[in-house]
């Protein structure tokens, strides 16, 4: 950025920025009257910042008030920057005082993020940005009614080793305990959050069928979890958090593997369901625990307030028979919004029926998932397509070739 040049310019030659996110002031507004009193008392002592094309970057309100006082020209500091830098400078100059138009500000920051611009230079910290996006863009999380059972009866399309591209999301059909699975999936990226629901080792079987790796000897199950958790730890950012749903009956193995893999156990959250789940125990289960933590010796990001508790009350999915231990989308969206920002990568190494991916889609995050069972990869793919209403942004990378989903199905692959 070059040094600003000072000049006195006619107000009629200055162009207000159409994107300016500041709320427009009018006579009688407290801020308007403050600016007016200052100009009357001290004159126009603070130059307006304008770009070389005469677009006002900082000083819209002062120009408006000055014109109302009869000024025809004002002192200006002229800079020569591109439009992306101009927008960032607008935010930075206006951050200290005044009120924002929240929607315009959120759109402007999103525009900068989409241009890969470092929005930190605007003076807004990540938690402030996420809070802003939450106010403006967050909407009620919607559950779906995708028929998983019907999908499971169809011929399997997915194959081991496939990498599915579902819009901005990536799903690999592979084994979550193998490092090479993550090498292919992540492409060198690191996850900003891990949220997953591994097999519980309780030998669950419902109409959707058994979960793979759900009936192991105690020591084997620990080794399985440890291997998976180590891969998660190695593919997370230093400040990423991790959430692990599990069964209380296997709590010892989960906690032992969690800590030994390199995580700090901060606490255990509880999903309180609206109805019990019939089982063999004298006490019927109406909750599921979820480990919460982050890397040992590291830090973690938090984007919510201090009023959140360890009890999460969400109704079970009406079609929970679709996948054993299936989670509602709103439940998965809750920790996602607490521990990540829009545009962040959320890793789920046990994607199952895809609730994490559905929650990421609705909250503006990017899901990178692993699923071992080909038939449930099909469930994830078609659940996404049904939510989007189109398969236009769905592709599979198979044998080094990127194939549109429509071509794959039309070609009869898997029939």
Segments from the language model and where they lie:
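Core catalytic lobe of class I
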Residues: 3-377
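S-adenosyl-L-methionine
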Residues: 162-183, 381-415
